[in-house]
Amino acid sequence: MSINLRSSGCSSPISATLERRLDSEVQTRANNVSFEQTKEKIRKMLEKVELSVSAYDTSWVAMVPSPSSQNAPLFPQCVKWLLDNQHEDGSWGLDNHDHQSLKKDVLSSTLASILALKKWGIGERQINKGLQFIELNSALVTDETIQKPTGFDIIFPGMIKYARDLNLTIPLGSEVVDDMIRKRDLDLKCDSEKFSKGREAYLAYVLEGTRNLKDWDLIVKYQRKNGSLFDSPATTAAAFTQFGNDGCLRYLCSLLQKFEAAVPSVYPFDQYARLSIIVTLESLGIDRDFKTEIKSILDETYRYWLRGDEEICLDLATCALAFRLLLAHGYDVSYDPLKPFAEESGFSDTLEGYVKNTFSVLELFKAAQSYPHESALKKQCCWTKQYLEMELSSWVKTSVRDKYLKKEVEDALAFPSYASLERSDHRRKILNGSAVENTRVTKTSYRLHNICTSDILKLAVDDFNFCQSIHREEMERLDRWIVENRLQELKFARQKLAYCYFSGAATLFSPELSDARISWAKGGVLTTVVDDFFDVGGSKEELENLIHLVEKWDLNGVPEYSSEHVEIIFSVLRDTILETGDKAFTYQGRNVTHHIVKIWLDLLKSMLREAEWSSDKSTPSLEDYMENAYISFALGPIVLPATYLIGPPLPEKTVDSHQYNQLYKLVSTMGRLLNDIQGFKRESAEGKLNAVSLHMKHERDNRSKEVIIESMKGLAERKREELHKLVLEEKGSVVPRECKEAFLKMSKVLNLFYRKDDGFTSNDLMSLVKSVIYEPVSLQEESLT
C-alpha cells in the first residue's frame, strides 16, 4: 500500500491563533508605505502600457518624404527628436543599452538615425558623432556570438547601400562592407528562387532593408485594418515611401498624433504587454493583490478574442498567451486559432517560423500544455518541445546570448506544467529574474517603459518570505500536534510530516488558506500512519477494532481498544475529524463531519480488503484491484476535507454529484498507477499486490514488462488529461472552480513526487521542501537593478 499528498487552491476564514498573527502582520505590511506604493505602481502598469521609444523606427518614419515635396520630411518632429536624443557615446537606441544582446541593435538604430539626418541634410555634428560610434564598435558587426535583430543581415547592409546613395561612407572597412552586401544580395537571390509563405512574410517585414520589392500585391496581404504592415512603424514607413498607400499614411499619422515625435517599435501592443504583466505577477506569486485589475484585462481580452481582433489573432505569441490565460481563468475559449500550428509546418509558414522565433515557440509550447487532451494541441506540444530542445542544445554550443529566454526554455522543459508546484516555481522565478525581464529584440529592441523590475522583485521577495514565515509557524504547530498525540510512539509508522505539509504549502500558499493547509497536512500524516498500520503494524484484530470504532462513531461512550496502538490512532483520528468538521462548519454553514467520517471509513475498509488479499494470498482481478486501490491510495482524507476549507460553498448535492466523485476517482486512479509503476520492483519482491504485476498475470501478456509499464504510464497520462479537462469545463459544472483546482493541484503534486523515485524518497524533493518552507529568499543588490 502507498500514500500520497494533496493540494488545493482557495480562500477562507482562519483559525483564531493564526488569525491574530495574520492581522498583526498584514497591518504591518499595510503600514509599509513603500510596499503599498509598489502595489500602486503595478496597478498603474496594468491600466496603461508605456512602450519604450524606438530610435530605429522613428528614423524610418523621419525618412518619409512629404507628398507635396520630396525634399522635405512629412514628419519633421521625428527629425527633431533624433537631433535631440542622441546618447553621449554617439549612439541612438534604448537607455542602458550596454547588454551584450543589444550591441547590434544599437548599431542598427544608430545607422538608421544617421541616414535620416543625412537624407534631410541636417545634424552634421550628430552624424559625425554617430559615425565615430560605429567605427569604435565596428568589430561587433561581424561578431557571430552577439544576438542579431530580426533581418539584420538584410537590413544593415541595405542601409549601408542606402548610405552610398546619399554619398555617406560608413567606417566599417571596405572588405567588411563588400562581404556583407554580397551575402545580402546572395540571400535575396536565393530566397527569390524558393517559395514559402514564411519567406514572403519575412521579405515584406524587412521591406526597409530590401528597398526593391516593386509588387504591392505581395505586400498588401500583410496590411492590417489599422493600415500598418505587421504593426511595425518602420515597415509601414518604408511601404508608404515606396507605394504611397493611403492606409499606411493613415497609420503613420495616427502614430504621430498619439506619440507626438517618437514612435515605438510596434503598435498597437497593449494586449500582449498587459497579458505579459499578468503572467509575470502570477509567475512570482503576487497576482492575488491585483485580482480586480487582472479580471478587467481578461474580460477585455476575451471580448477581443471573440471578435477575432487582429492584435490578438495575427500575433502568434499574443494568441498563444491569451488562450492560455483565458483558459486558466475559466473563460470559454476555442483552440481553433491555434489549430494551424498543430504541425511544425504550420509554424514554418509564418513570419515567426521563418525567422525561428524561439519566444513564439515557447508560448505555443505553454499553450499546448494548458489544454493537453486535444489531439491537435498534443501534436503541438510534441513538436514545440523537440524544437526547444534542439534550440537549447544549439545555444549551449554557441554560447549564445539571451540568458533570460534560455532560462525560460530550460525551466519550461525541466518543469512541465503538470508536475510543477506554484511556490517552487515562484521561488525559482524570483531568483533567476527571468520573470521580470521585459526587454525583447525583434527588428529592434523594446521594453515596457513603465515597468520597474526591481519594484516587482522586491514585492515578490517580501510576499514569499511573509508567507513562508506563516508556513514555518504552521509546521511548528504540526510538530507539537504529533508529539501531543503520541504519533512518534508508533515505531512502525513513517514520519513524513515535512512532505505532507510541503505538498499543501507549495500549492495552497496564501496566508488565508491556513485551515486548508493544516487539514491537508494532518490528512497526509494520518493516512501514512494508517497505511503503515494496515501494512505492517497491526494484527487483524487491531485493524477490525479500528474500523469498528470509526464505524460506530460513539462520542459519548467509552471506547474499547484492543491495543494501545489502536487507542493512539483512533484518538487522533477522532479529534482531527471533529476539528476539521468544526472549521468546515464556519465555511459551509452546515455539519459535514459525517462525510469526513465516511471518507475515513471508506479508506479503512479498502485497506482491510487489501490486507485480506495479502494474508489469504488471493489474487483479485485487475478491475477489482483498481476499484479498491484508488480508494486505498488514500487521497480521500487529504484532499476531500480540504475542499470544504477553501471558501466556496459545497452543498451536499454537489459533494454527492458525479462530477465531484469523478474528480476524486481520476486523480486517485492516476496516483495509484504512478505509485504502482514506480514501486513495481520493490512490491513484487515483497509479494505485494501491484497493478503492473496483476496486469502481467491476468492478461497473460507476452509483451515485456517494460512495454507493459509504458502502456500503464500512458493510461496514467490519460487519467491526468481527463482530470484536467474536467477541471477546465465550465458549462454544466456543479463543483466550484476553486475546489476543482484542488484536485488538479494534487495531480501536480503526484506527478512531481513520482517523476523519479517511489513517493517519499527523493533527495531532490527534500531540497524543494526546505526551499519552500525553511529558506527565505534574498537577492543581491545587483539583481534588483
Swiss-Prot record:
GO terms for cellular component: chloroplast; chloroplast stroma. Binds 3 Mg(2+) ions per subunit. It is found in: Plastid, Chloroplast. InterPro entries: Isoprenoid_synthase_dom_sf, Terpene_cyclase_plant_C1, Terpene_synth_N, Terpene_synth_N_sf, Terpene_synthase-like, Terpene_synthase_metal-bd, Terpenoid_cyclase/PrenylTrfase. Its cofactor is Mg(2+). Pathway: Plant hormone biosynthesis; gibberellin biosynthesis; Secondary metabolite biosynthesis; terpenoid biosynthesis. Keywords: Chloroplast, Lyase, Magnesium, Metal-binding, Plastid, Transit peptide. Belongs to the terpene synthase family. Tpse subfamily. Involved in the biosynthesis of ent-kaurene diterpenoids natural products and in the production of gibberellins phytohormones. Catalyzes the conversion of ent-copalyl diphosphate to the gibberellin precursor ent-kaur-16-ene. This is Ent-kaur-16-ene synthase, chloroplastic. It comes from Arabidopsis thaliana (Mouse-ear cress).
